[in-house]
């Protein structure tokens, strides 16, 4: 079994290796593209780094999330851009990014800072990205996030009588609770 390549920088005494493997560089480059497209408001750009069969696992049981396909992402996207005026997305503590070269996986901790039609929205995430063998595309995305913060946004939308509908990224209180 190939060991997982992990670089954790906890103080100034530890530094990155002077040379990174080509696989590691490719994985991190694709991860960087994922992060930069996340808040782009361009569905073609967002999907361009995914394989046609990419599966997006939203791993928050309290929202009854299932696996989302590219087609479902495309169908739900108009509701996303109607809800958010701005969506900034970035990696928290990049030095804590985990890279498993053999499995072609990268784990990042990220944050969103956004302006929605009902005010500010912030959240934190953990993403695990499974890449293709050539490391250029994402085959699977596993997303974990703070459900309390998302529920707060949901309740604020409902208070303004803004319906997201069943196909939206989350359901209204009437259909969820």
UniProtKB/Swiss-Prot annotation:
Deletion phenotype: Strongly decreases the production of austinol and dehydroaustinol.
Something else known: In A.calidoustus, the austinoid gene cluster lies on a contiguous DNA region, while clusters from E.nidulans and P.brasilianum are split in their respective genomes. Genetic rearrangements provoked variability among the clusters and E.nidulans produces the least number of austionoid derivatives with the end products austinol and dehydroaustinol, while P.brasilianum can produce until acetoxydehydroaustin, and A.calidoustus produces the highest number of identified derivatives.
Signal peptide as annotated in the record: none
Protein name (record): Austinoid biosynthesis clusters protein F
Disulfide bonds: none
Entry similarity comment: Belongs to the trt14 isomerase family.
A single BP term in Gene Ontology: terpenoid biosynthetic process
Annotated metabolic or biological route of this protein: Secondary metabolite biosynthesis; terpenoid biosynthesis
Function text: Part of the gene cluster B that mediates the biosynthesis of austinol and dehydroaustinol, two fungal meroterpenoids. The first step of the pathway is the synthesis of 3,5-dimethylorsellinic acid by the polyketide synthase ausA. 3,5-dimethylorsellinic acid is then prenylated by the polyprenyl transferase ausN. Further epoxidation by the FAD-dependent monooxygenase ausM and cyclization by the probable terpene cyclase ausL lead to the formation of protoaustinoid A.
Gene3D superfamilies (alphabetical): 3.10.450.50
Quaternary structure (record): Homodimer.
Domain of life according to the entry: Eukaryota
């Amino acid at each position: 079994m190939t060991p997982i390549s992990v670089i954790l920088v906890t103080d100034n005494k530890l530094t990155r290796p002077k040379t990174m493997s080509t696989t590691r560089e490719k994985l991190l480059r694709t991860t960087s593209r994922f992060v930069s497209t996340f808040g782009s408001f361009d569905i073609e750009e967002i999907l361009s780094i995914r394989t046609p069969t990419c599966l997006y696992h939203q791993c928050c049981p309290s929202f009854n999330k299932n696996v989302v396909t590219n087609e479902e992402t495309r169908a739900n996207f108009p509701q996303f851009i109607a809800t958010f005026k701005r969506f900034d997305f970035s990696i928290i503590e990049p030095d804590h990014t985990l890279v498993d070269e053999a499995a072609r996986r990268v784990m990042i901790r990220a944050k969103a800072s956004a302006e929605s039609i009902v005010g500010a929205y912030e959240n934190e995430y953990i993403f695990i990205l499974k890449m293709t063998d050539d490391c250029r595309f994402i085959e699977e995305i596993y997303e974990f996030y703070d459900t309390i913060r998302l529920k707060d946004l949901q309740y604020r939308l409902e208070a303004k009588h803004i319906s997201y509908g069943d196909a939206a990224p989350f359901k209204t209180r009437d259909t969820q609770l």
